[in-house]
Amino acid sequence: MQQVAIIGSGNIGTDLLIKIKRRSESLSVAAMVGIDPESDGLARARRLGVATTSDGVAGLLAMPEFEQAGIVLDATSANAHRANAAALAPYGRRLIDLTPAALGPFVVPAVNLDEHLSAPNVNMTTCGGQATVPIVAAISRVTPVAYAEIVATVASKSAGPGTRANIDEFTETTAHALESVGGARRGKAIIILNPAEPPLIMRDTVLCLVGDVDRDAVTESIHRMIADVAAYVPGYRLKQDVQFTPVDPAEMRILLPDDTVDVRWKVSVFLEVEGAAHYLPAYAGNLDIMTSAAVRVAERIAGAEVTA
């Protein structure tokens, strides 16, 4: 059983705690770290018998439980993660970063986890990236994707101050991941915070421009990828049939890199991500997919270390 520490006692950190305690067969939480001694996350951790500190990463380093924690999951903020990574660097811990800091490579478990199992610090990109990069990758393994555009629509209630403050970073990081992990020549990301009441489940739209293509092969690849993601995010599903729409290459040229061949088809994929409601509400699929992906990464890293 691999011991882990969680830094951040907010919604994300607390959901990580509950997920690992309830369903992980290979991970155990050694310590929960926060900066607010009155936070609900630290209180829940204490009730579950997990050691806690409200003194941040300095408090973690002083805890006897730190010696057993080989993996640290950081659910704080980009600036805090940079400081935490520097403080933890001398101790050789494996870091899983759920912030926009992106000090290490982007990891989307269904796409590229095997490539980064030995990386000292991996970044979970964004909720939109975790939901949509797999679809772009599924299409690009069949045919080149000249342009990928995603629209992530999340319940406004699920977006806290940190998410709102990092909207620009969200779009930039997600677009980068569409290219560097998904394989698109050019990526664009848009996020919508939907204020509807009652809150709606996360929806994601993926639009890809491609050349002449085998529709059956693309559709089959997308369905395989959705099954791969649903293995660790059970609420991840296709909302409608995959759609193929012919496009005018001349009209699309403005969206494409200069050296891209003409595109012929727009592939449209419509997704829904329902949360598991372990700690967060079911509509917060945007948060659940991040924590579920991070737990999968931690479990795979732990398994790789056991077999090494």
UniProtKB/Swiss-Prot annotation:
Enzyme class: oxidoreductase
GO biological process entries: catabolic process
Listed Pfam families: AcetDehyd-dimer, Semialdhyde_dh
GO molecular function: acetaldehyde dehydrogenase (acetylating) activity; NAD binding
InterPro entries given in the database record: Acetaldehyde_dehydrogenase, Acetylaldehyde_DH_C, NAD(P)-bd_dom_sf, Semialdehyde_DH_NAD-bd
Active-site positions on this chain: 127
EC number(s) on file: 1.2.1.10
Catalytic activity of the protein: acetaldehyde + NAD(+) + CoA = acetyl-CoA + NADH + H(+)
Keywords for this protein: Aromatic hydrocarbons catabolism, NAD, Oxidoreductase
CDD domains named among the record's database cross-references: ALDH_C
Superkingdom per UniProt: Bacteria
Recorded family membership: Belongs to the acetaldehyde dehydrogenase family.
Record's protein name: Acetaldehyde dehydrogenase 2
Binding residue positions for NAD(+): 9-12, 158-166, 286
